[in-house]
Amino acid sequence: MANKIIESSDVHLFYGKNEALKGINMDFAENEITALIGPSGCGKSTYLRCLNRMNDLIDSATVTGKFLLNGQDIYAPEMDTVKLRKEVGMVFQQPNPFPFSIYDNVVYGLRLSGVKDHRVLDEAVETSLKQAAVWDDVKDKLHESALSLSGGQQQRVCIARVLAVKPKVILMDEPTSALDPISSTKIENMLLELRQQYTIIMVTHNMHQASRISDKTAFFLQGELIEYAPTKKIFLNPTEKETEDYISGRFG
């Protein structure tokens, strides 16, 4: 059994009086890809955003329960959320590069952390862009705007920006849904490589993607975690009827 890196227990989240998460219990192991699936509005993205406290940015959101990152309480009052979001990075659905050069995008987090040594920054740019499988595309135009790149290249630069600060966990909210099939395949292949060094938790509506690249899959429905198991079991022999109905396309 791989070491647990994140543990969550009895997680409830309310938007005002509306309960969006209803007692979620989930643990995540190191160096695994976990897919969170379920119909729109089921709570999977809400749960994902709990893992690095992005829901703190929503005034009406209230979270209860426990989240531990390597045994440390994510929601403890003394937790530094800037530090947390370095350790638990986030990649969004739409590529969101800053209106800077490719180089400045990748080193943004490092500079915020006070890194000034140009050799360190240069090395981080090359290493991160290689990990994100976009170095060969951009190595000759690092000082051009990241906004000039294709959507798939922009998303991989955003992934490189997350990797540059050396997170422990990478959260992804439908990272390929806005991309063409070729770009999506490149990112899927890259995630399989990154799994050797990182824990990856991703929301996806793409059942084929979940079955291809994830080690475990969690099915959410109406704010509840219905089933959480190895991906092969979820897709070939689910325990719960709701899981089978969703995967077979009977609803969702």
From Swiss-Prot:
Entries under CDD domains matching the protein: ABC_PstB_phosphate_transporter (cd03260)
Group of enzyme by EC: translocase
GO molecular function annotation: ATP binding; ATP hydrolysis activity; ATPase-coupled phosphate ion transmembrane transporter activity
Gene3D superfamilies per UniProt: P-loop containing nucleotide triphosphate hydrolases
Family statement drawn from the similarity comment of this UniProt entry: Belongs to the ABC transporter superfamily. Phosphate importer (TC 3.A.1.7) family.
Annotated function: Part of the ABC transporter complex PstSACB involved in phosphate import. Responsible for energy coupling to the transport system.
Official protein name in the record: Phosphate import ATP-binding protein PstB 2
Lineage: Bacteria, Bacillati, Bacillota, Bacilli, Lactobacillales
Gene of this entry: pstB2
